[in-house]
């Protein structure tokens, strides 16, 4: 008798978790680089390894909020794309999806420009995601 409610609860938990896992898989976002921002300056550079081509990019912030002004994307062919953000990104959230100009692009590095971070506070971790 006591096993039936346990089995039903396990089935419900499994069914509820399945759509979330499927959503993550179909979004195709890959974390291609990350960095904990220095906080001592208002500019940081994130190098991206490999030679993959992407259509879109977004930045996700963890551990603490970050007041992002903008970021520059530098491609392997030395072209650049300046992206204005001008928003406070809360911990656990991402910027809007940014279409990369031109055909599918190979990213070399991204330079972040943000408002200074208070000393002694938790420094944000920024993840670069692309697809």
Question: What is each residue range found by the language model?
Answer:
Residues 1-8:
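Bacterial N-terminal signal peptides that target proteins for export
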Residues 8-15:
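Bacterial N-terminal signal peptides
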Residues 18-22:
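Sec/Tat signal peptide C-region and signal peptidase I cleavage site
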Residues 31-35, 82-90:
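Solvent-exposed serine/threonine-rich low-complexity stretches and specific carbohydrate-binding patches
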Residues 36-68:
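Short, surface-exposed binding/anchoring microloops in extracellular/periplasmic proteins
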Residues 43-49, 94-101:
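Exposed aromatic-hydrophobic patches
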Residues 52-59, 102-119:
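Noncatalytic modules at the cell exterior or secretory-pathway interfaces
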Residues 62-85, 124-130:
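Short, surface-exposed beta-strand/strand-loop-strand elements in extracellular ectodomains
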